[in-house]
Amino acid sequence: MKDMVTLGTTGITVNKNGFGALPIQRISQEDAVHLARKAYKAGIRFFDTARAYTDSEVKLGEAFDGIRSEVYIATKTAAQNAEDFWKDLHTSLRNLRTEYIDLYQFHNPAFCPKPGDGSGLYEAALEAKEKGMIRHIGLTNHRLTVAKEAIESGLYETLQFPFSYISGE
């Protein structure tokens, strides 16, 4: 387990090298599917995408059709309310050709979604988790204050945060 990492408190253990699928929106369907499958054959099991990454989910869905249970897929929603959360989740499930998403993340929200905050986002995520549509709830953010709040809340199983030596935070 030398090059393995456990994702937050999910219990998911994968190779520390994951596949960030934002760039595959810039290449053809055929090339993207080939690249994702090649990464899988090379031992990559964690694939990260988002609704905002145009057709990235569709390309991963095709790439892993038939081997879905052998990979971990994370995707994200930028929804600001429960109604849009459900729309995004159903679209992601259809695009990814799956009945569940391993890690569903709030994508860089301006605030930390919490129960009772009026947005309904966290409640929707919990309901989706109870229904088996998502397995784990995470948050991605570029704001240190929101990231700290997410950690301190204890509500999130993962936090995806960019680190940079040249950042002021």
Which sequence ranges carry the predicted segments?
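N-terminal binding-site loop/beta-alpha segment at the start of enzyme catalytic domains
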Residues: 1-71
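Active-site mouth loops of central-metabolism enzymes
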Residues: 18-30, 74-84, 110-112
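Active-site beta-loop-alpha junctions enriched in small/polar residues
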Residues: 22, 50-52, 76-80, 106-109, ...
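CE4/NodB-like, metal-dependent polysaccharide N-deacetylase domain
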Residues: 86-105, 127-131
